[in-house]
A protein has these predicted regions:
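Glycoside hydrolase catalytic-domain context in secreted enzymes
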Residues: 1-547, 562-567, 571
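Terminal connector regions
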Residues: 542-587
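Conserved, compact domain cores that house catalytic/ligand-binding motifs in diverse enzymes
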Residues: 596-617
């Protein structure tokens, strides 16, 4: 079945959790605005986390002789006018926020292909952007595969080849082939440039062919693996009075259309024709005493009085109420952006009415990006399931009843309202241009710098057990630029249930040599512990972990001085810190042009003597 700009293949496949969910696993084995229609395809608002998870995924897939294609390169952070909008982004922001996930993926995993985006970057289409596709991707990072276009993203095939875009998708019916031949004949396209593009494509074809092997697979085993992954991705956001886990002896009201028809994947080109999609209603008898009422439909925002009345009656006869809420498919998808961060009004209204029955209410959310929660202070529990793949219902039920311990952590900040988002005044732009005016202050970098109250911070997530941290140590008190600093600490499970803890390592620049975020995630580790068990966790920090991108020197730079090393349970919950001194012999030179001041030159040891010799009598 062929459609415009896409191919829908009618095969059954196992649908694993979407990127919005897997990012919350913080398990190795960029989000700008919460309104972006394809946020469910993005791993995290944090470039370090996104890069590490992407590299691990690529290495795993390609170990099976299956190629990966990372996309969309670059600054493709909205669906509105995505075919033509120009993302206006300064180089420091690109290098620190929007490039690192791609850079890490390339350097650590070498994906077979990179897909360039539809949009323009600072005025030039990504498919024709030589600085992007050749200078940065190949020369700076060492990418060895081929670059392909997004579907129909080629504007000028010859310019694309010259820039480093090798493969056009889905093809032009021969029109661009003729343009290439003509350009070679006229001399505007060098034959060796064309040959290089062909060689890059053939190298991947040969790599696959030489390692091709027959594989057997089991949809049932893969479904169980999807359930296992989904359990690792679920984030417990609230658990007041230990309302969770549920007991099999309690009478539970199961409310909401998503309990019968879970939203488990995003719309558009990422859609999977799934093998099997169990729902909570089908599974309820395997877990406890549960009664179901629909309450609302899942295909929009239509209030239906009869459904609400039935839900309130069923809920009134229960001990606890579990509401399966979320965003309908039509609220977020490829090709358009969200208009707001709200759940459908019919869902919010029903949740509020349920909280007034005097029974504990737990909300399970199915959504691809943050939502506002006007009822957050009135419910007892919140379980963020995201778009958890075809086995998400099984995973959610396991979490609700304590058969699994939640260990997911938010890979993005949940602001209290849309207006708090740093891109609010500039998204989605106007007149085919969007200005990334917030610069490097994206996600928690912005909220933490502003000391802004948020609904739930980056890295946040609860467990059914408790963990304590102790004995934070670093292997050196002073390091040189070439050194790797090793950070170690002990983590103890002080609760009564086995669980996994996500230890987050943040770095804070105390040299004040440039405008920097309050702290940035620079490493993390997952550790599974039995009750009473203690393990030592060690993480490394290299020079890049301390550095920022200096656009004047065109390089990463970390000033000599003091840096704070912090261990946190989220970007806001910092448990312990220590300090290290970085000794950097490389001094930042002032930019010498018509705007340089004498004071700038005198502040730099490498230019001060020169200035003194010429100014002193």
């Amino acid at each position: 079945m062929c459609e415009h700009r896409s191919i829908s293949i009618v095969f059954e496949a196992v649908c694993f959790p979407a990127a919005c969910a897997t990012g919350s696993s913080f398990d190795r084995e960029l989000l700008r605005s919460p309104l972006c229609g394809r946020n469910f395809e993005y791993l995290s608002e944090d470039p370090y986390l996104a890069g590490e998870l992407a590299a691990s995924y690529i290495n795993g897939v390609q170990s099976q002789n299956v190629g990966t294609s990372i996309k969309h390169f670059a600054a493709n952070n909205q669906e509105n006018e995505r075919m033509s909008v120009s993302a206006e982004v300064d180089e420091r922001t690109l290098r620190e926020i929007y490039f690192p996930a791609f850079e890490t993926a390339v350097k650590k995993a070498q994906p077979w292909t990179v897909m360039c985006s539809y949009n323009r970057l600072n005025g030039t289409y990504a498919s024709e952007h030589k600085w992007l596709l050749t200078d940065v991707l190949r020369n700076d990072w060492g990418f060895e595969g081929y670059v392909m276009s997004d579907w129909g993203a080629v504007r000028n095939r010859v310019k694309g080849i010259i820039a480093g875009m090798d493969l056009e998708m889905p093809g032009s019916g021969g029109a661009n082939d003729r343009a290439i031949i003509q350009a070679v004949q006229e001399g505007s396209l060098k034959e060796e440039t064309l040959d290089l593009a062909v060689e890059r494509i053939l190298n991947i074809v040969y790599r696959y062919a030489e390692n091709r092997r027959n594989e057997e697979f089991s949809r049932e085993k893969d479904h169980q693996k999807a359930a296992e992954i989904a359990r690792q991705c679920i984030v417990l956001l609230k658990n007041e009075a230990q309302v969770l886990p549920l007991s099999a002896n309690e009478k539970i009201a199961l409310i909401g259309g998503f309990a019968e028809k879970p939203r488990y994947q995003g719309g558009g080109s990422s859609h999977i024709n799934s093998h099997a999609v169990p729902c909570a209603v089908q599974l309820k008898d395997q877990y406890g005493n549960m009664t179901y009422a629909k309450g609302f439909t899942t295909d929009g925002d239509q209030y239906e009085e009869a459904l609400e009345k039935e839900a309130l009656e069923v809920a009134g006869q229960s001990d606890k109420i579990v509401v399966f809420a979320g965003l309908p498919d039509v609220f977020e998808s490829e090709s358009y952006d969200r208009e707001h961060m709200r759940l459908p009004n019919c869902q919010n209204q029903l949740i509020e009415k349920l909280t007034k029955l005097g029974k504990p209410v737990i909300v399970v959310l199915h959504n691809g990006s943050p939502v506002e929660m006007p009822w957050v202070d009135h419910v007892y529990g919140i379980v963020e399931a995201y778009l958890g793949g075809e086995a998400v219902a099984e995973a959610v039920m396991d979490i609700l009843y304590g058969r699994a311990n939640p260990c997911g952590r938010l890979a993005e900040t949940f602001p209290r309202q849309l207006e708090d988002n740093p891109s609010y005044l500039n998204f989605p732009g106007m007149q085919k241009q969007v200005n990334y005016a917030e610069g490097i202050f994206v996600g928690y970098r912005y909220y933490d710098a502003r000391k802004m109250d948020v609904l739930f911070p980056f890295g946040y997530g609860l467990s059914y057990t408790e963990f304590s941290y102790s004995n934070l140590t670093i292997d050196k008190s002073r390091i040189a630029a070439k050194d790797t600093l090793m950070v170690s600490l002990d983590v103890t499970n002080t609760g009564s249930m086995e669980g996994k803890e996500i230890v987050q390592l943040y770095v804070s620049d105390k040299t004040y040599s440039a405008s920097r975020p309050v702290r940035e995630l620079k490493n993390f580790a997952a550790v599974t512990l039995k009750p009473g068990e203690t393990k030592t966790v060690s993480m490394g920090l290299d020079y890049r972990a301390f550095a920022w991108y200096d656009t004047e020197q065109k390089d990463w730079y970390a000033a000599g001085g003091t840096y704070e090393i912090c261990i946190g349970k989220s970007s806001r919950d910092i448990v312990m810190c220590t300090e290290v001194v970085l000794e950097n012999e490389k001094e930042k030179l002032p930019k010498i042009d018509e705007n340089v001041m004498i004071g700038d030159l005198m502040d730099c040891a490498k230019t001060a003597d020169y200035v003194e010799e010429r100014l002193m009598p």
